[in-house]
Amino acid sequence: MDTHSPETQESAPTSRRALLASLIAAGASVAVAGRASAADDAAPTTTAPPLHSDADAATLNSLITREAAMVATYNAAKASVSGDDLAVIELIASHHVAYVQSLAGYLGRKAGATTAPALPVNAGGYSVLAPQLASLEAATAAAHVAALKTIQGLDAATLVASIITVEARHEAALLLSAGGSVDSVASGL
């Protein structure tokens, strides 16, 4: 007797814990990518050195400013939530901290300020905050995509591209965990 109850993709429940787990995995991949791009391997190699352009500094510094603003925004949002909702906010905030650190680490001495004021959001519980934060994630991802079009160095482009994919996951997780549908995530609503 088969007691397995298959659920379709549309009817499968999406828990905040499952979304949290996917965000953890995505954040870890960005942290590793940031460290890998900044690694200095002394072993001789026959391949060409990775492309690193000093012309990317201004663009990357603008991304640091945006990511620092996201950190401040999530830190401010923590006061409005608790429990699992707080865990989600703290996790995403930690990803943005990692992005600031990765971008600043890549730039080294050319990195600018790593703090910025919070972006405006209306105070409220998780169901009020999550859609607003998702919208900020979408705007932040769009800023990274626009920056990617101008970045010349391969290492910088790789780092920024790795951040974009996680920012998109942040947006989706926030929308879904606040009660949005898969369709709203796919259409960006």
Where are the language model's segments positioned?
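All-alpha RGS (Regulator of G-protein Signaling) helical domain and cognate RGS-like helical scaffolds
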Residues: 2-14, 21-189
